[in-house]
Structure formats: structure tokens, C-alpha cells
């Protein structure tokens, strides 16, 4: 029998497909099962247009059989089969797809779409097999043929005996090497796991022989092991069912079955789109974050299916980083089964799906926020930080998408509020959205800088996470109201009379403040009379964009450049301490230095900043006490 050569640059092309397109050897079984499913689909389609054919789905199946002794793995289908010419065309030409040609010829619009449109999947078998044998008998033919190949060298086609319509593909599994073990592809448990992973939702039964224990005939207490044919795939994916048929329990069972999380999901979104791009999707928003969520080990992404066949465990391109907590899957008939990660990044359909999913997630979160506030706050406790990162990242590109999902603790309401809720309560004379930063709500409430804003009756948002101020700086404003830190030099509250009084105090005590600035040198940008303090003697204000809390965050980072906020030491001119400062300025330079350093260190402590010289600080306290 003469060996024929493949109709392509076979060795180079075969090597490229095996080594580049497929990154995991187990993929070969997914490809063979998908081809088998296509073969049955073709009979189904023909039956729709040919009255002489009937399609009883119970008669159609795929069977996978392993033989350890012979080192063979066989995939059998009851599909349409192939003639000699079709074997030549579809298996003799690498990257020739019979399914694609069939689809183009028949232009199927009945929803029974064909998976294998790309003609390379079959050759994945050579990743695990030394030899591939294909026996096939075509529908309407009396003859059967066998196609055999040991790889790039070529193939043979000859007549063979086969009674039933369909195709039988037998792989002679490779022997183990030092680097690779191929025995796993002869183990039933491993084969079953691969089927469940990639082909669980193929619409036809995938059968395997399973070893089960059954009572011996005529004996109640004795059991024997027998081989029994069982269907190992689920066949009907939940995402193709009508939403009205499904309960919350159905979705929760799917969530658990797919190992998306150890707890129940907070909510789910079931999407079915039949437009410019067709896809089905089930998305889950978890209540609790995974233990590794804020680590570099965490991988975002949704499971990606092509017509029910898994093509990627985690497709990162489907989710923006700010929604990386979402779990779930997408199934589209418009995606290539053999598409690579690199190609996915530029796939137009995938980009459309990702854009739509992004909108659906936001809509679901907004619905939770509006209608199930307690649930949303539970979610926000786990993932609010990620939403804030989303506002800050990419130079604020997503801030408009996320701003209405943010929550912050309110000084007035004593609970989390949205920016919209804050703005809706603002008095007419309030110009800014005020915020204060600190380690906890309790500490922020005691900050001296909050006194003036609070006395004015204005609401203050409390920022307790390191990302908060960075996100707000990127947001800059909400509903045309700018954000303003209570530590800002200008709070936008003073009346004209207040301005005149402050200016007069600055002029009157100019020499005192200049002396204090001289004592502190470059530790502060300036010393001045405070407009914001009521009962406290001292605090820091900041000039410029970098606040004290931002300074802490930036300087805690690796390879920090030791960023410094432009600190201004503000003194309360109405506090008793101010009289002491005035007296010391006129009489005792050393005492002024002592009091100035004490007040500076007091301001550091209020902000939670380290004192530069704790020993000197304690000595200064002792000097005051004696």
C-alpha cells in the first residue's frame, strides 16, 4: 500500500500546530470529542431536509474506550462518517475542515451549530500517540475505509470492515519518557476528568465503561465487580436553559459544582444575547473575597466555552481589573475552538462580549445597591477596595463607570453613604464635599481639623483605607462639587469678616510665627494662625496636592522616594497655649523653642506620624513639668 504525503508543508505545520496551538496535551481528547459531536450534528441537519432520514437522539452517542494492555485509546461516534474522498480531503490536508465546508454549504440557521470549523484539532492526537488509525463508514455508503498515519511522514487509506455508520479513531499511546508520562491517558479516572472538564456540555451522551460493584446473582451478601456502560457528561448546560426554569438553588449548585467558591454567591447574572455577537453567560458576584484575592497569585478571568466546549479556564480579557472578583463563564458559538491567548486579545467578538459583560456587572451592582442595600454593603466590605483601585488605575479611565458604586462612612449618618446621597443633602452654602482621613472612624472623629467643618453643620466623609484619597484625587469632583480635605489650607468656609480677622492676626503675630518657623526649619512649610481650630491648640494643615495620609502610604511602599506633604503648623490663637507662646517669644527664646517643638510633636502624634527624636520629646515634657 503506497504511503501518501500530507497536502501541506506537513512536518513544519504539524509541529507548529502541536507545539504552538496546544499548550496542554489533554486537549487532544477535547478535539476528538468535538469532531465526533460534529459528525452527529451533520446527520441531524441532513434529517431536517431529507424525509428519508429520521433523527432519534437516543441512537446517537460518543464512546471513549481505553485498553491498557494494547496501549490504545479509542473514540467512537455514530455520526455521519466519511467516504474515501472525505478521508483524503479532511485528514490528508492539514488545516482542512470538513465541518467548515459543511456549514458553508448548508448555512445552518437552526441553532444546531457545528463546533469544529478550523481543521487542526484532529492532529492534536499526535501529541500523545505514535500512530492514529481512523475507521469510517459514511452515511449512504456500503464501503468502509481505514486511514492510518504515524505523523508527518504521511498516511495510508485502504478498504476495511466496518458494519455501522460512523467513525472510530484509535490512538496508539506513546511510551513514557524521562520527561513525560503518557500512562495517564489510559486511566479511566483521568479520561473521565478530562471529559468533565472540557466536554461536559456536549449535547450527545459520552459513554465509558465503568467498574461498579453489584450483588452476585443468587447471593444477598456477596458483591462482584462488573463493567457497566455509563454516560459521563451532563449534556445540557445550565446557561442554555430558560431563566424561568431555574431557581436560586440551581445556580448555587452550578457555582459549587464549578468550584467558583466555598460559600454561596451573593447574586448571579444570567445573560443570553443573540445579536451582533451571540453568547450565553452566567456571572456570579461572591459575598466573601478569596484568601488570595489581594495577592499576585490571584488570577482573574471567566471560563470561556465555544459552543459548549471549554477552550480556556480563565479568560482574563473578559473582565476589567475592577471587576476581577466576578466568577462564571461565557459560551459563544462565534468563537474559534482553537483560538490562542494571543489571538483572543485582538478578537472583535470577544471585545464586544467583554464590553457587554462590563455593563451587566455594573447594572447588577447598582441594582443591589438600590434594592438590597444590606447585601451590597456586605459585598462592599470585601471588594469596595477593588472598586476604588479601579477609579484610580489607568489615570481614571473608569472613574465614571465606578463612582456611583462607591461608599464612604458619613459623620452625620454614622453609616456608609454614596456620593449621590451626600450631595443630595448638601446645604446651599456648602461649596465642597469634605473628607477626613485616618486609621479608624474613632480617630478621625477626634481630629482637630474636623472641628470647623463639623461646627458649620457640614457632613464629612471618613476615609480609612490607603487607596481612598488616591481614588478621590483622581475623581476630583462629583456632580460638579469638588472634594476637599479638612486639612486643606483653604476650606472655602470663611466669610469676608473671618478673612479680615485672620489677616489681622497674621500681621499682628507675624514675628512670633516667623520665629517658630525658624526653630522648626524645613520640618514645616509655614506656621500660621488657625481658622479651623476651636478647642484644640494645634494641628497640621497641608498645602499642595499631597496630604499627610498620602505621604504615609507613599513612604510605606518599597523603594520609596520619601515623599513629604507640605505641612503647615497651625496654632489656635484663641487657646490658652497661645498666650504662653506670646510671652515666651517676648521673654525667653529657649522656652519658645521648647514649646514650639512640643506643639510640633503633638501635631505629629495627632496624625499618627512618628516623632523624629522620642528621647528629646520626653525630655521636653519633663522640662515643662519641673
Swiss-Prot record:
Localization per Swiss-Prot or TrEMBL: Cytoplasm
InterPro entries in UniProt: HATPase_C_sf, Heat_shock_protein_90_CS, HSP90_C, Hsp90_fam, Hsp90_N, Ribosomal_Su5_D2-typ_SF
Alphabetical list of Pfam families matching this protein: HATPase_c_3 (PF13589), HSP90 (PF00183)
Domain of life where this protein originates: Bacteria
UniProt xrefs under SMART domains: HATPase_c (SM00387)
CDD domains for the chain: HATPase_Hsp90-like
Keywords for the protein's UniProt record, in alphabetical order: ATP-binding, Chaperone, Cytoplasm, Nucleotide-binding, Stress response
Region (C): 553-626
Primary localisation category: cytoplasm
GO MF terms, alphabetically ordered: ATP binding; ATP hydrolysis activity; ATP-dependent protein folding chaperone; unfolded protein binding
Chain residue ranges for the region called A: 1-341
Residues covered by region (B): 342-552
Cellular component annotations (GO), alphabetically ordered: cytoplasm
Family to which the UniProt record says this protein belongs: Belongs to the heat shock protein 90 family.
Alphabetized HAMAP family for the sequence: HSP90 (MF_00505)
Function: Molecular chaperone. Has ATPase activity.
PANTHER family: HEAT SHOCK PROTEIN 90 FAMILY MEMBER
Subunit: Homodimer.
Protein name: Chaperone protein HtpG
Amino acid at each position: 500500500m503506497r504511503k501518501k504525503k500530507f497536502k501541506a508543508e506537513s512536518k513544519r505545520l504539524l509541529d507548529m500546530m502541536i507545539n504552538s496551538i496546544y499548550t496542554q496535551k489533554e486537549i487532544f481528547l477535547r478535539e476528538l470529542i468535538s469532531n465526533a459531536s460534529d459528525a452527529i450534528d451533520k446527520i441531524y441537519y441532513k434529517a431536517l431536509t431529507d424525509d428519508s432520514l429520521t433523527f432519534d437522539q437516543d441512537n446517537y452517542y460518543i464512546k471513549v474506550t481505553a485498553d491498557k494492555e494494547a496501549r490504545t485509546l479509542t473514540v467512537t461516534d455514530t455520526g455521519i462518517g466519511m467516504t474515501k474522498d472525505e478521508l483524503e480531503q479532511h485528514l490528508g490536508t492539514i488545516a482542512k475542515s470538513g465541518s467548515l465546508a459543511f456549514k458553508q454549504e448548508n448555512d445552518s440557521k437552526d441553532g444546531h451549530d457545528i463546533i469544529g470549523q478550523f481543521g487542526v484539532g484532529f492532529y492534536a492526537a499526535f501529541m500523545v500517540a505514535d500512530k492514529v488509525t481512523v475507521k469510517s463508514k459514511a452515511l449512504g455508503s456500503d464501503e468502509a475505509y481505514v486511514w492510518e498515519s504515524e505523523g508527518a511522514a504521511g498516511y495510508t487509506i485502504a478498504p476495511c470492515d466496518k458494519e455501522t455508520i460512523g467513525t472510530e479513531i484509535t490512538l496508539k499511546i506513546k511510551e513514557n519518557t524521562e520527561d513525560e508520562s503518557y500512562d495517564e491517558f489510559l486511566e479511566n479516572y483521568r479520561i473521565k476528568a478530562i471529559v468533565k472538564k472540557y466536554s461536559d456540555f456536549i449535547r450527545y451522551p459520552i459513554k465509558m465503561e465503568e467498574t461498579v460493584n453489584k450483588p452476585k446473582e443468587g447471593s444477598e451478601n456477596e458483591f462482584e465487580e462488573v463493567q457497566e456502560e455509563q454516560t459521563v457528561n451532563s449534556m445540557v448546560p445550565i446557561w442554555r436553559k430558560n431563566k424561568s426554569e431555574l431557581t436560586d438553588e440551581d445556580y448555587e449548585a452550578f457555582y459549587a459544582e464549578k468550584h467558583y467558591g466555598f460559600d454561596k454567591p451573593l447574586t448571579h447574572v444570567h445573560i443570553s444575547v443573540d445579536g451582533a455577537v451571540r453568547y450565553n453567560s452566567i456571572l456570579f458576584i461572591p459575598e466573601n473575597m478569596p484568601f488570595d484575592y489581594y495577592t499576585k497569585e490571584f488570577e482573574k478571568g471567566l471560563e470561556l466555552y465555544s459552543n459548549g466546549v471549554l477552550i480556556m479556564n480563565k479568560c482574563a480579557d473578559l473582565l476589567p481589573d475592577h471587576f476581577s472578583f466576578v466568577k462564571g463563564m461565557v459560551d459563544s458559538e462565534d468563537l474559534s475552538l482553537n483560538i490562542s491567548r494571543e489571538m483572543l486579545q485582538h478578537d472583535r467578538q470577544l471585545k464586544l462580549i467583554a464590553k457587554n459583560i462590563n455593563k451587566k456587572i455594573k447594572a447588577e451592582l447598582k441594582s443591589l445597591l438600590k434594592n438590597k442595600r444590606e447585601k451590597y454593603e456586605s459585598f462592599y466590605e470585601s471588594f469596595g477596595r477593588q472598586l476604588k483601585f479601579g477609579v484610580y488605575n489607568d489615570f481614571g479611565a473608569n472613574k465614571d463607570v465606578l463612582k456611583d458604586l462607591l461608599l464612604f462612612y458619613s459623620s452625620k449618618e454614622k453609616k456608609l453613604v454614596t456620593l449621590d446621597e451626600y450631595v443630595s443633602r448638601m446645604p446651599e452654602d456648602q461649596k465642597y464635599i469634605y473628607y477626613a482621613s485616618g486609621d479608624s472612624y474613632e480617630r478621625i472623629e477626634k481630629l482637630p481639623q474636623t472641628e470647623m467643618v463639623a461646627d458649620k453643620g457640614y457632613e464629612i466623609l471618613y476615609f480609612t483605607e490607603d487607596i481612598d484619597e488616591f481614588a478621590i484625587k483622581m475623581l476630583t469632583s462629583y456632580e460638579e462639587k469638588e472634594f476637599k480635605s479638612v486639612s486643606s489650607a483653604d476650606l472655602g468656609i470663611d466669610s469676608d469678616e473671618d478673612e479680615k480677622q485672620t489677616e489681622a492676626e497674621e500681621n499682628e503675630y507675624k514675628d512670633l510665627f516667623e520665629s517658630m518657623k525658624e526653630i522648626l526649619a524645613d520640618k514645616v512649610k509655614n506656621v500660621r494662625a488657625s481658622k479651623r481650630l476651636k478647642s484644640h491648640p494645634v494641628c497640621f494643615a497641608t498645602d499642595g496636592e499631597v496630604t499627610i495620609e498620602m505621604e504615609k502610604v507613599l513612604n510605606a511602599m518599597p523603594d520609596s522616594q520619601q515623599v513629604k506633604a507640605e505641612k503647615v503648623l497651625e496654632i489656635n490663637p484663641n487657646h490658652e497655649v497661645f498666650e504662653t507662646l506670646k510671652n515666651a517669644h517676648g521673654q525667653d527664646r529657649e522656652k519658645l523653642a521648647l514649646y514650639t517643638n512640643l506643639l510640633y510633636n503633638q501635631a505629629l502624634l495627632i496624625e499618627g506620624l512618628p516623632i523624629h527624636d522620642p528621647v528629646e520629646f520626653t525630655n521636653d515634657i519633663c522640662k515643662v513639668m519641673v
